[in-house]
């Protein structure tokens, strides 16, 4: 067993030993923890040699101590085991069994002891835990008690200190008060002394005053005595006076003068004496009184002073008493506080004692516990020492080593963790640097983003500029294309003109005879027609111009509105400055144009007022001629005949008569051809798809109207009219084709211009004029029309020329009575008209028509005066009267009278054929002709030229007249026959038309009867469709550039194209029109075209009233229901199709113009047809005939007669005009009754009703087509909306709402389409849509003012106006819808207000419409009643006189209506402008919001930059702090190194001194030995010498060395103290460099004293050198410090210290601190130092050289060794001592030189004045800082630039807003000027004019 134990022991490593001595060797813990407590559990005890508390963490030293103790115990245990084994082997050499037994027993005991030990260890662990818990509890309680006691003591101390402070303050205050009080008492004492002295003086004075008072009393007594004497004397005087009076009473006879003289002398003497005495007394008295008063005042003042002094002294006494009381109270309080402080101090001492006692008790308890523990440990140690079990000890040691290794690993982990923390700190620092870099990168990114934004803005502006340039380029190309096409057309027209001139020259001679025949009849009619005023034509043309100016003004307003909408869009889309500038330019141009329009309007108004006043003066003169005017043709042809009269002789006129006979024959063939065409028309059954052009429909309806009107006359004359109308239709269709292909709107105008310039010449006007007409016709012929038209122009011209000749003959016979006053006015009127045309040409510079008129005026300036005026009138007439012949048949019907039927029948065809060129030209251009026809229906014929002043001077004979009259009568008879045939044919045509209109489902254009030329068009329907589509597309393109002209072309003649081309649009919409153009096409063209066709039919229907009122009412009701359904559809569109606003907003500008144009046209047509067609025709014809009479024919007598008649007629006219308004309704009813009496009227009414039915069906079809197209448009819009939703991020709810609304709109359109197809009544939907209808009614009523409100028109006419107003409202309603949608998208608040406004307007308009319908019905009933009361015979007589009144009243009424309509439109325009301004304001507000947002962003960026700057500055400060810390640490290190070096130097110095002392002692010993030898050798030889001299020198050297040693020790101690002080003050010196100078001043003077002390007298040269050095350094250091800033206090300290230490020959290093010596460098190639040090070094070197030379000499003089041996040894000691002294001095000089060298230091020369080490870092930092500053500066610059741009855009928006305000003001002025017009055109100043609009 022992072997096994030993073997186990062998396995233990050598570092471990036995554990037998482990437990006793471990000392006990203070807290009583048993070190064995953890051993039983395998835990290493926590106790090292030092007493370690269990809670404290152990460090490596504890573990090492423990390991060493364990090793020692292990070794001891091993030794004990070895000795015990040896002892056991010695004892037990016997049998081993006993040993085994004892061993087994011992093992058993050991096991039992182990168990006991474990139990005890567990008990000990429990006890130790209990003790620990108790100790912790007691310790925590003791700590808490201590803390409470400490807190209380602290509180008490604080309170006491506060009280003490307060008391000290109070004491100081009280002392101050006491001092003040003492000072006050002293001052009071002084004052009292003064007062007492003053009182004594006052008393003395008072005694003097008493004496004075006695004197005064005496004087007062004297004064009183004097007063008494005075009184007595006065009494005497009184007595004397009484005596005198008594004496005077008895002696009355004595003279009064004597008595007075006697009394006066004594009285004066007495009075003088008394006065003198009184004065003296008074003066004395006054002086005494003054002195008394002064004395009294002095007394009072002194008494007051004494009283105040007494009061002050009392106060002071009281204050002193109060202060003493306060002092006593304060002293008491101080004593109390002192007692409290003593008590508290005693309590504090007791508490301390208690604490100490508790601590001592605790320590005693712990000591007892420790003693118990030590006893237990001693027992356990004894047990262990007895048992000596190796295995358990080894296992425990192993466990403990494992624990130690674990703890070591834990410590290493902690160390690693700390290292990681350090690394993390470094990483955080690097992260901070990274964040700085990131911030810099972000700044750079921001700058790049700003640059990118600027580049994007620049690219955007460039793209916008390029787009605008492209648009301009495209427009220029379009303009070039148009000009090229116009040039081509000009070339073609010139060719045709040449051909026409040839044809005219061939046919010219055939027409002379017929002109002679027609001249007689024209002369007959001339007698009657010469009384018409000449100015009416110009008036009418001026009225047309005025109305056209109204239209232009409206168009300008609409254009400006479009520009405003475009401006709003551009503001919303982009902030481009170029767009804004362009919009500004547009606004300026509009403003200028508007100002010009206003000026032209004012001039126009002036001229109109003058013309109206002139016409008013002439109107009365023409009344007498109305009964004589019989023939319409005689009026129409007189002017034109004048042109040819001056060029033809009588033979030529006879030839023209024969030509006229030939013409009648040809007319017969034409009549036959017309029969054939009517038969073909009726046989065809109208199987075609509809006529391709609505031009035919408009012409045909007017043709039918003319035929109906002619049925009332008993003669047949319609064959020529129909033929002429057919010609017109064919020609107009051809010119329409030509226009649509060429794209030229004003081709016709060029022809008129050339014609007028030719006609103005005087060479051959007839031929040129005819050539111009033929030239107009020539390019318009197609292949199938040429056969019909080849013979017609020549024949028609022959007829016209014959009639002109007859007119000339008749005019020669006309009396000149009525000519003078009328021709006199023509030049003035013509001149005014010229001015009017010029102003209008300026008012619309883009209108080519006006420009052509202006060009004609310029050309006409070359001809004579009359020609100029004629040409000016003519150019205006070209615009105003182009379609007169189209409606002449209608006028003829009203002009026919039973008296002159034969003559009129004979002349009518000739008239119609007399101007074929004009008719063809007028109908050839659809836009101009139909527009002007709509403008004015007055049949004013255009004159070829009026420069014909000599044409009336040709001779004429009576024979020619009679011949011509007979021939004319024959021709009239033939014409009667032809007209009867024509009437029959006409009736057949009406029946065919009725059959056509009666079809159940008529085609779209069935209502337009096909003319005779229609067959030609049926052959090529595809070509016509192509023409029409191209024309419609061309119109869409031209709509923006020239709205007025293109609109008039579209809406009056061309709109039939639009619906006709709809099928092609449906089939192939991409080829023809885009969706936008389809919408534009629908809204702007289709509805007005329908309206125009309605107007064409209603012109005839308005006259044909009958008693079928119930039927008409039913029709009106049906139409209203259909219209309401249509309005519901419109409202649904208005409500739901918000997405279509972008497509429909394009139409806003044109629709208003269309509405404004269309409605006055409808009103004018109706009124003109109703009132003034017949009368105005004749009236105007007379004006035109009489206008151009030459002024040479005016007679002075006739002029006087005319003046008288004018005055009379003006008076009568004034009276009649006052009665006009009263007679208005009666005249109209009578006139309608006259028309209704003829039987064919009722047939025509039936036909008109059938026509209305067909028209309604057509309208339903049109509505169906519109619904189909709008539904398709809605489908495309829904698809586009879905794509937009996919493309953009839109709110889902909003998108869903929009999609639902669009779907509802599409469903409504489908329902409406089905209703149009099925024809069901819409009344079912009315209940659910009453609210919608109210809104539509209000919208209708907004345009009620444009409807004719006059009570004259019949119900059918009112109905047609109602329909047209509804259709025009559709476009206007779309406009309003678009505007409301726009505003609802932009500003949602506007939608509600607009909705309410629309509802109110619709309601009011609906009410007014119903009232107008009721008044129309009442008027119809009145017409029917009054029609039965008059017979036919009186109608014709009465009508001639009544129609003037009716025309006047109708014109007045119409002008009023027109003014109201224009005012309303202006109000609406201003309202629209206000809305646009509001939108602009909103856009401005949005811009300001965006500006503020940008400013906020700018502020945030600025704050970010400031924050970055602050962070950068903070980082810089942090870096500087770190640099300073590094410097400080470097300085500290250098100081420590220098201290170590100094100590080493001191040690080396001491060693050297010791060595030198030892050498000297050895030398001394050798000398002693030599002396002894010498003494021994020769006892007498040394006596003669002085051996003590050498000893004395050695002793002196030793003493000097000792002194030097002592002084070096002193200097080392002082240096050590100074080094410690410097180390203590090192941080302060690093921060405060100012102290270094003081240290320098202190440190430098110390060393010379030390040098003086320890150098002594032995080395005077050394001391002198050192003094020189330090004196020079003293003198120079301040200068060097001031001159060279790198030298600091530390350096000077190092110099002084080194110089101090160098006195002891210590090598010194100059201390150079970084940061102060910027030039110092270890690797420097230069040396820097003071010049004094350098000079001292040179001195030392020279001294050393001298010493070495002396030593060299001594060594040479020394005797050789042989001489020494020989015995010559006497003189040796002296040279040896000198050599030793020279060696020592050489050493000292070398050391001093070394020290001087150490004072210099190595430097590197400065590079550009900067330190290469430190300044590079500073330079880098500065460079980074400057970079950051530059970046910030650039960013601020960019932000400022953006701010400037924003401010500039804001200013531009302000400028735009100001311009808009200015334009708004101008519009207001224009509206005011327009509102002035109704006041000027009151009934008394109006004329029967017909302005067209």
Swiss-Prot record:
Q: Which GO terms describe its molecular function?
A: calmodulin binding; gamma-tubulin binding; microtubule binding; transcription cis-regulatory region binding
Extract the ranges annotated as region (Required for centrosomal attachment, Golgi localization and CALM1 interaction).
1861-1870
**InterPro entries hit by this protein:** CC_CDK5RAP2_MYOME, CDK5RAP2, Cnn_1N
Region annotated Interaction with NCKAP5L sits at 58-196
Q: Where is the composition biased (Polar residues)?
A: 1753-1766, 1884-1893
User: Which GO cellular component term is one of those annotated?
Assistant: microtubule plus-end
Which parts of the sequence are annotated with region: Interaction with CDK5R1? 1726-1768
Q: Where is this region: CM1 motif?
A: 51-94
Q: Which keywords label this protein?
A: Calmodulin-binding, Cytoplasm, Cytoskeleton, Golgi apparatus, Microtubule, Phosphoprotein
A Pfam family matched by this chain, by name?
Cnn_1N
Oligomeric and partner information: Homodimer. Interacts with CDK5R1 (p35 form). CDK5RAP1, CDK5RAP2 and CDK5RAP3 show competitive binding to CDK5R1. May form a complex with CDK5R1 and CDK5. Interacts with pericentrin/PCNT; the interaction is leading to centrosomal and Golgi localization of CDK5RAP2 and PCNT. Interacts with AKAP9; the interaction targets CDK5RAP2 and AKAP9 to Golgi apparatus. Interacts with MAPRE1; the interaction is direct and targets CDK5RAP2 and EB1/MAPRE1 to microtubule plus ends. Interacts with TUBG1; the interaction is leading to the centrosomal localization of CDK5RAP2 and TUBG1. Interacts with TUBGCP3.
Give a short account of what the protein does.
Potential regulator of CDK5 activity via its interaction with CDK5R1. Negative regulator of centriole disengagement (licensing) which maintains centriole engagement and cohesion. Involved in regulation of mitotic spindle orientation. Plays a role in the spindle checkpoint activation by acting as a transcriptional regulator of both BUBR1 and MAD2 promoter. Together with EB1/MAPRE1, may promote microtubule polymerization, bundle formation, growth and dynamics at the plus ends. Regulates centrosomal maturation by recruitment of the gamma-tubulin ring complex (gTuRC) onto centrosomes.
| Record protein name field | CDK5 regulatory subunit-associated protein 2
According to its UniProt entry, this protein's organism is Pan troglodytes
Q: From which lineage does this chain's organism come?
A: Eukaryota, Metazoa, Chordata, Craniata, Vertebrata
Q: Which gene encodes it?
A: CDK5RAP2
């Amino acid at each position: 067993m022992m072997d096994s134990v030993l073997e186990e022991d062998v396995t233990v490593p050598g570092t471990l030993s036995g554990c037998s001595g482990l437990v006793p060797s471990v000392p006990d813990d203070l807290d009583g923890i048993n070190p064995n407590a953890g051993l039983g559990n395998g835990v290493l005890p926590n106790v090292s040699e030092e007493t370690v508390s269990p809670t404290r963490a152990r460090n490596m030293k504890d573990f090492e101590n423990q390991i060493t103790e364990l090793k020692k115990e292990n070794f001891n245990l091993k030794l004990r085991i070895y000795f015990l084994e040896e002892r056991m082997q010695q004892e037990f050499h016997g049998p081993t069994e006993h040993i085994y037994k004892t061993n087994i027993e011992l093992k058993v005991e050991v096991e039992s002891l182990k168990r006991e030990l474990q139990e005890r260890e567990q008990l000990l662990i429990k006890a130790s835990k209990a003790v620990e818990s108790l100790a912790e509890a007691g310790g925590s309680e003791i700590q808490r008690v201590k803390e409470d006691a400490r807190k209380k003591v602290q509180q008490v101390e604080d309170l006491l200190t506060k009280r003490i402070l307060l008391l000290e303050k109070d004491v100081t205050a009280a002392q101050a008060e006491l001092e003040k009080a003492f000072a006050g008492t002293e001052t009071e004492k002084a004052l009292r002394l003064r007062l007492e002295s003053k009182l004594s003086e006052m008393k003395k004075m008072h005694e003097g005053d008493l004496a004075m008072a006695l004197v005064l009393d005496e004087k007062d007594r004297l004064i009183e005595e004097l007063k008494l004497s005075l009184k007595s004397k006065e009494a005497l005087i009184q007595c004397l006076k009484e005596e005198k009076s008594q004496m005077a009473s008895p002696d009355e006879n004595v003279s009064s003068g004597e008595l007075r003289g006697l009394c006066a002398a004594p009285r004066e003497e007495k009075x003088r004496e008394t006065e003198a005495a009184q004065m003296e007394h008074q003066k004395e008295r006054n002086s005494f009184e003054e002195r008394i008063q002064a004395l009294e005042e002095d007394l009072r003042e002194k008494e007051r002073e004494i009283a105040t002094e007494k009061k002050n002294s009392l106060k002071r006494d009281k204050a002193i008493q109060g202060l003493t009381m306060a002092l006593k109270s304060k002293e008491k309080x101080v004593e109390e506080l002192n007692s409290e402080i003593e008590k508290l101090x005693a309590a504090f001492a007791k508490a301390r004692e208690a604490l100490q006692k508790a601590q001592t008790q605790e320590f005693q308890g712990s000591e007892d516990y420790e003693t118990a523990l030590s006893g237990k440990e001693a027992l356990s140690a004894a047990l262990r020492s007895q048992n000596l079990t190796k295995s358990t000890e080894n296992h425990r040691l192993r466990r403990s080593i494992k624990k130690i290794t674990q703890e070591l690993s834990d410590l290493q982990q902690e160390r690693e963790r700390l290292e990681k923390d350090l690394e993390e700190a470094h990483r955080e620092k690097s992260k901070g640097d990274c964040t700085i870099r990131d911030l810099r990168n972000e700044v750079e990114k921001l700058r790049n983003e700003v640059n990118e934004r600027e580049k994007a803005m620049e690219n955007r502006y460039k793209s916008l500029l390029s787009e605008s340039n492209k648009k301009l380029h495209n427009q220029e190309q379009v303009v070039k294309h148009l000009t090229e096409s116009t040039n081509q057309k000009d070339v073609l027209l010139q060719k045709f003109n040449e051909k026409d001139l040839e044809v005219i020259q061939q046919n010219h001679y055939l027409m002379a005879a017929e002109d002679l025949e027609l001249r007689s009849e024209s002369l007959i009619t001339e007698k009657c027609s010469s009384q018409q005023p000449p100015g009416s034509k110009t008036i009418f043309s001026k009225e047309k111009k005025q109305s056209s100016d109204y239209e232009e003004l409206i168009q300008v307003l609409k254009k400006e509105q479009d520009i405003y909408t475009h401006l709003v869009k551009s503001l919303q889309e982009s902030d481009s400055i170029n767009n804004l500038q362009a919009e500004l330019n547009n606004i300026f141009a509009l403003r200028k144009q508007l100002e010009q329009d206003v000026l032209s309007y004012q001039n126009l108004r002036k001229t109109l007022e003058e013309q109206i006043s002139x016409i008013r003066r002439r109107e009365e003169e023409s009344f007498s001629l109305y009964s004589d005017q019989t023939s319409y043709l005689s009026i129409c042809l007189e002017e034109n005949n004048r042109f040819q009269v001056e060029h033809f002789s009588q033979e030529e006129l006879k030839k023209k008569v024969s030509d006229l006979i030939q013409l009648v024959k040809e007319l017969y063939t034409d009549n036959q051809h017309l029969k054939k065409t009517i038969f073909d028309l009726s046989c065809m059954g109208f199987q075609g798809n509809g006529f391709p052009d609505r031009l035919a429909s408009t012409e045909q309806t007017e043709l039918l109207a003319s035929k109906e009107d002619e049925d009332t006359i008993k003669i047949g004359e319609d064959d020529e009219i129909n033929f002429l109308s057919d010609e017109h239709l064919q020609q107009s269709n051809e010119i329409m084709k030509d226009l649509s292909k060429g794209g030229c709107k004003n081709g016709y105008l060029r022809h008129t211009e050339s014609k007028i310039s030719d006609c103005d010449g005087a060479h051959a006007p007839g031929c040129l004029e005819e050539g111009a007409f033929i030239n107009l016709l020539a390019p318009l012929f197609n292949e199938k029309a040429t056969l019909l038209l080849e013979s017609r122009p020549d024949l028609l011209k022959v007829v016209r020329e014959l009639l002109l000749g007859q007119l000339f003959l008749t005019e020669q016979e006309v009396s000149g009575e009525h000519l003078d006053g009328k021709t006199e006015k023509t030049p003035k009127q013509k001149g005014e008209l010229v001015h009017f045309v010029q102003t209008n040409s300026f008012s619309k510079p883009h209108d080519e028509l006006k420009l052509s008129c202006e060009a004609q005026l310029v050309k006409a300036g070359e001809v004579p005066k009359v020609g100029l005026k004629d040409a000016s009138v003519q150019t205006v007439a070209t615009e105003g009267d182009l379609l007169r012949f189209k409606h002449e048949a209608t006028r003829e019907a009203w002009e026919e009278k039973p008296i002159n039927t034969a003559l009129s029948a004979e002349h009518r065809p000739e008239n119609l054929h007399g101007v074929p060129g004009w008719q063809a030209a007028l109908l050839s251009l659809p836009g101009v002709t139909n527009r002007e026809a709509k403008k004015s229906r007055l049949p004013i014929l255009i004159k070829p030229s009026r420069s014909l002043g000599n044409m009336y001077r040709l001779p004429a004979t009576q024979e020619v007249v009679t011949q011509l009259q007979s021939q004319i009568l024959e021709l009239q008879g033939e014409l009667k026959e032809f007209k009867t045939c024509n009437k029959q044919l006409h009736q057949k045509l009406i029946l065919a038309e009725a059959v056509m209109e009666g079809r159940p489902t008529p085609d779209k254009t069935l209502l337009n009867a096909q003319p005779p030329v229609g067959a030609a068009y049926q052959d090529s329907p595809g070509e016509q469709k192509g023409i029409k589509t191209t024309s419609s597309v061309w119109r869409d393109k031209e709509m923006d550039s020239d709205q007025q002209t293109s609109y008039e072309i579209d809406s009056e003649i061309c709109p039939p194209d639009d619906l006709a081309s709809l099928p092609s649009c449906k089939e192939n919409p991409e080829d023809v029109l885009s969706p936008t153009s389809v919408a534009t096409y629908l809204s702007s063209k289709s509805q007005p075209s329908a309206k125009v066709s309605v107007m064409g039919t209603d012109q005839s229907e308005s006259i044909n009233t009958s008693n079928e009122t119930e039927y008409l009412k039913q029709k009106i009701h049906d139409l209203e229901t259909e219209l309401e359904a249509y309005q519901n559809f419109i409202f649904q569109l208005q409500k739901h199709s918000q997405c279509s606003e972008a497509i429909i907003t394009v139409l806003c500008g044109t629709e208003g113009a269309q509405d404004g144009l269309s409605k006055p046209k409808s009103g004018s047509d109706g009124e003109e047809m109703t009132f003034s067609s017949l009368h105005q025709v004749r009236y105007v014809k007379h004006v035109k005939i009489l206008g151009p009479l030459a002024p040479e024919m005016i007679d002075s007598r006739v002029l006087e007669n005319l003046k008288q008649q004018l005055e009379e007629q003006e008076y009568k006219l004034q009276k009649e005009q006052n009665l006009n308004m009263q007679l208005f309704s009666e005249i109209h009813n009578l006139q309608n009754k006259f028309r209704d009496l003829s039987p064919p009227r009722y047939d025509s009414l039936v036909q008109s009703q059938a026509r209305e039915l067909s028209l309604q069906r057509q309208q339903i079809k049109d509505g169906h087509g519109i619904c189909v197209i709008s539904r398709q448009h809605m489908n495309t819009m829904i698809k586009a909306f879905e794509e937009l939703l996919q493309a953009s991020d839109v709110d889902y709810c909003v998108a869903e709402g929009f999609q639902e609304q669009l779907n509802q709109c599409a469903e409504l359109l489908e329902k409406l389409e089905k209703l149009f197809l099925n024809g069901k009544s819409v009344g079912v939907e009315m209940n659910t849509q009453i609210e919608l209808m109210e809104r539509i009614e209000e919208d209708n009523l907004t345009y009620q003012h444009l409807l004719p409100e006059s009570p004259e028109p019949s119900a059918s006419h009112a109905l047609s106006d109602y329909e047209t107003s509804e259709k025009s409202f559709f476009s206007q309603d779309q406009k309003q819808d678009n505007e409301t949608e726009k505003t609802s998208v932009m500003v949602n608040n506007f939608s509600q207000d607009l909705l309410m406004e629309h509802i109110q307007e619709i309601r009011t308009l609906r009410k007014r419409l119903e009232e107008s319908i009721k008044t129309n019905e009442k008027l119809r009933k009145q017409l029917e009643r009054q029609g039965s009361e008059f017979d036919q015979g009186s109608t014709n007589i009465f009508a001639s006189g009544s129609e003037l009144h009716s025309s006047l009243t109708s014109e007045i009424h119409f002008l009023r209506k027109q003014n109201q309509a224009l005012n309303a439109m202006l109000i609406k325009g201003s309202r629209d402008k206000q809305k646009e301004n509001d939108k602009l304001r909103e856009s401005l507000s949005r811009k300001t919001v965006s500006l503020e947002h940008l400013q906020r962003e700018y502020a945030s960026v600025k704050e970010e930059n400031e924050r970055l700057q602050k962070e950068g500055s903070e980082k810089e400060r942090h870096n500087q702090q770190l640099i300073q810390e590094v410097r400080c640490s470097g300085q500290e290190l250098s100081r420590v190194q220098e201290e170590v070096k100094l100590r080493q130097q001191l040690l080396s110095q001491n060693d050297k001194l010791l060595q030198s002392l030892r050498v000297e002692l050895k030398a001394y010993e050798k000398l002693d030995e030599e002396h002894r030898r010498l003494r021994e050798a020769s006892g007498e030889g040394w006596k003669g010498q002085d051996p003590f001299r050498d000893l004395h020198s050695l002793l002196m050297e030793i003493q000097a060395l000792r002194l030097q040693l002592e002084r070096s020790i002193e200097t080392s101690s002082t240096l050590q103290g100074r080094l410690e002080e410097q180390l203590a003050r090192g941080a302060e010196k690093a921060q405060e460099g100012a102290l270094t100078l003081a240290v320098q001043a202190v440190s430098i003077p110390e060393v010379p004293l030390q040098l003086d002390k320890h150098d002594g007298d032995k080395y005077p040269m050394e001391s002198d050198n050192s003094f020189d050095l330090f004196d020079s350094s003293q003198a120079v250091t301040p200068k060097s410090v001031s001159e060279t800033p790198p030298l600091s206090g530390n350096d000077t300290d190092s110099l002084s210290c080194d110089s101090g230490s160098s006195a002891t020959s210590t090598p010194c290093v100059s201390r150079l601190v970084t940061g102060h010596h910027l030039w110092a460098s270890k690797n420097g190639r230069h040396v820097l130092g003071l010049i004094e040090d350098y000079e001292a070094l040179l001195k030392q070197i020279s001294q050393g050289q001298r010493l070495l030379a002396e030593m060299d000499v001594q060594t040479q003089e020394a005797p050789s060794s042989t001489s020494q041996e020989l015995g010559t040894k006497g003189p040796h000691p002296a040279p040896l001592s000198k050599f030793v002294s020279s060696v020592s001095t050489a050493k000292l000089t070398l050391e001093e030189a070394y020290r001087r060298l150490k004072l210099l230091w190595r430097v590197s020369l400065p590079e550009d004045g900067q330190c290469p080490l430190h300044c590079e870092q500073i330079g880098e930092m500065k460079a980074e800082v400057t970079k950051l500053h530059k970046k910030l500066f650039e960013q601020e610059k960019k932000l400022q630039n953006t701010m400037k741009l924003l401010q500039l855009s804001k200013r531009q928006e302000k400028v735009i807003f100001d311009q808009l305000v200015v334009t708004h003001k101008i519009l207001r002025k224009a509206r005011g000027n327009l509102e002035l017009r109704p006041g000027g055109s009151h009934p008394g100043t109006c004329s029967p004019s017909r302005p067209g609009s």
